[in-house]
């Protein structure tokens, strides 16, 4: 609705200086949803993304909802042990990762894990810094090659699982926590009411969008309310 009512209004800002309007966020999400559907990932499957607070994270999350997928955000600090467990436990079919963050190579990590991930069919790298192997797709290529058609929107039950988040696994393997469309919407509504947020407000969100705080109040907030968001990608202490 926001993309129609206020298409050119900025929905999200990033500390890189990049911005996303409501219309541009929807356009990118629609294009990505078409490509996900073309890859054969169908409603009810799990999509995992292990991205920092970068512009690509927003259309990835929205596209997953368009396709009726279960969204599985994973914080970027997790390494092979945690990521491998989560991907298998969630039976994730499609994964979005960065190439490198602070010198760590996520493509190398998933390449070493892939033989032990029977459910994982597609890996998409955002911001690839060099040539990739044939079994890793470039996010930018998917977006460039996407048609301008409208993606088929999947109708879901509000009580269906929308997001699976995993605990840190301090005392063992990470534990899955399921949220339905209804429970996430209620959490968002409660926050907006308590904070009395309106169209003149902007929320600074330093929490990762792959954590429940950052996901709800970073990605979803502008599209369900009139409040805008500034996503902080990183900070130095």
Where do the model's predicted regions map?
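Conserved S/T- and glycine-rich ATP-binding loop of Class I adenylate-forming
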Residues: 47, 64, 161, 167-170, ...
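ANL superfamily adenylate-forming
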Residues: 101-158
């Amino acid at each position: 609705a926001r993309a129609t009512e206020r298409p050119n209004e900025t929905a999200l800002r990033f500390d890189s200086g990049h911005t996303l309007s409501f219309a541009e966020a929807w356009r990118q999400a629609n294009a990505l949803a078409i490509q996900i559907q073309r890859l054969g990932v169908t409603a009810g499957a799990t999509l995992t993304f292990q991205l920092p607070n970068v512009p690509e994270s927003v259309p990835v999350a929205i596209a997953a909802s368009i396709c009726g997928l279960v969204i599985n955000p994973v914080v970027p600090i997790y390494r092979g042990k945690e990521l491998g467990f989560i991907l298998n436990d969630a039976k994730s079919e499609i994964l979005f990762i960065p190439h490198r963050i602070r010198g760590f190579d996520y493509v190398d990590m998933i390449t070493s894990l892939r033989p032990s991930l029977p459910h994982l069919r597609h890996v998409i790298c955002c911001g690839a810094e060099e040539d990739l192997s044939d079994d890793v797709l470039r996010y930018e290529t998917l977006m460039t090659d996407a048609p301008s058609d409208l993606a088929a929107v999947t109708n879901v039950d509000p009580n269906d699982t929308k997001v699976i988040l995993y605990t840190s696994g301090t005392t063992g393997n990470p534990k899955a926590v399921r949220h339905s469309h209804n429970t996430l919407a209620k959490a968002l509504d409660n926050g907006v009411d308590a904070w009395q947020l309106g169209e003149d407000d902007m929320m600074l969100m330093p929490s990762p969008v792959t954590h429940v705080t950052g996901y709800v109040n970073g990605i979803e907030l502008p599209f369900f309310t009139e409040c805008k968001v500034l996503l902080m990608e990183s900070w130095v202490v």
